[in-house]
């Protein structure tokens, strides 16, 4: 398995390099019996990974949330849902590829999926606008929300954005208005809404598809009003202080759960979601199914009342 290691994972990377060298050696020379040594190093690597990941700080978790191999929305859609039919365009200006959405089935049940989509290679990153939606992306999302509401389909959103696109053209086309409209409309949808932060939850760019009955975060995701770098630049005029900002802002799942800003934390495989796509998709699917089962018990009136109470409770610990 080819892994991309972060700076704080370098000791793990060194061990994995030794393991790979021994494995290649044993494959070249079948007379060598070094399985014991390989297994010993694998055990050391696993133990070291557990030790490092049991004591991560907020900045390290931020790096995991941004990991280049971390699963994106389309990865989860492919592995959790069936019969996904993507819907495009806002019917007003254009189609923003940083927001993806459409109708799919979850265990044969029709649902509406919305998510931010980043890219991995340079061309794909540009195509997806680095996961930063424009107003037409949010208006496309709103169009899909209203379709879901009309046909009584639960809405499931997957949040992963550094923030809404800050370019002047986005402002000219009504970025603030598009985000605000989504916040208002999501609060009034008469269907169950389940939102999950799968990577970065950046400010209003995340909130525009993040108002729901259940708000979940993956174990190594982040959710904040501004990026640590942005906060550091404003407070200290120095982006090098981003690690301090990350710690002070309380952007990680455990802290946000303590503040009652999220409902559940979805556990990730050892080393992060990118280490085992099967485990993380299974965990996410199980969480969504549990949430849907719970929300299905409520009448439309109760669903809306509970959502209103949730929104009004924010800011009170």
Swiss-Prot record:
Gene3D superfamilies recorded: 2-enoyl-CoA Hydratase, Chain A, domain 1
Principal subcellular localization: cytoplasm
Secretion signal, residue range per the UniProt entry: none
Keyword Ligase set for record: no
Sections of the chain in a coiled coil: none
UniProt-listed InterPro entries: Acetyl_CoA_COase_a_su (IPR001095), ClpP/crotonase-like_dom_sf (IPR029045), COA_CT_C (IPR011763)
GO molecular-function term, one example from the UniProt record: acetyl-CoA carboxylase activity
GO biological process, one term: malonyl-CoA biosynthetic process
Family: Belongs to the AccA family.
HAMAP family on file: AcetylCoA_CT_alpha
Protein name: Acetyl-coenzyme A carboxylase carboxyl transferase subunit alpha
Originating species: Wigglesworthia glossinidia brevipalpis
Upper classification of the organism: Bacteria, Pseudomonadati, Pseudomonadota, Gammaproteobacteria, Enterobacterales
